[in-house]
Amino acid sequence: MKNTMKIAFAGILIALMFVLSWTVLGMIPLGVASATTVFIPVCVGIIFFDDFKYAVVFGLFFGIVSLVRSFVPQGFLDPYFQNPIVSVLPRLLVGIVGYLIYKGLTRLMKNRIIVSSLAGGFIALINTIFTMGILILVYFQDVNQTFADNGFSILTALKTISLLNMLPEIAIGAILTPIIIKVLDKISNKNLN
């Protein structure tokens, strides 16, 4: 794929992140927090481009989208994401670590569909782990009090977030990512299976 086409397609994926973040398809309010599908363009970008620089860019823009979106909160944890350490840093790490996971998977197996599915699931998983981990590291006392004010213990809240956010996000990432990659491979004649 020519460089101009790569940049244009990267721009489309980044624009898609912004569009998803402002629709119910991308940010699904669940009361405690918002489940997201905004990571799907990140998964697709990491796998389709197979380029560390692009993975960093996709992770960075995922974080910027989260930061911008936090100023119109839907869940009671969303205002904490107005801090770039909580919104941008974990998503930047998702781009970096997601790329490393993808590259590791490509060394273990050659089937691009299976690799895409596993990478999509793992990227969703690390998104939740990094985001919740950094949120709790930075704002433990505040988050603990926020949960208590809303009738939750922090442990119960984390279990709830894991069930309501993480598991569906993993499933969505594992299902949608390979479907999109397969279509893009056919379109770009980049079928590597």
Annotate each PLM feature.
Residues 1-57:
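Hydrophobic transmembrane alpha-helices
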Residues 29-33, 80-88, 93, 100-101, ...:
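Membrane-embedded alpha-helical hairpins and interfacial helices in multi-pass inner-membrane proteins
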Residues 50, 65-68, 142, 183-184:
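A short hydrophobic/aromatic micro-motif that marks alpha-helical segments and, especially, helix-coil
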Residues 55-66, 116-123:
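Central hydrophobic cores of alpha-helical transmembrane segments
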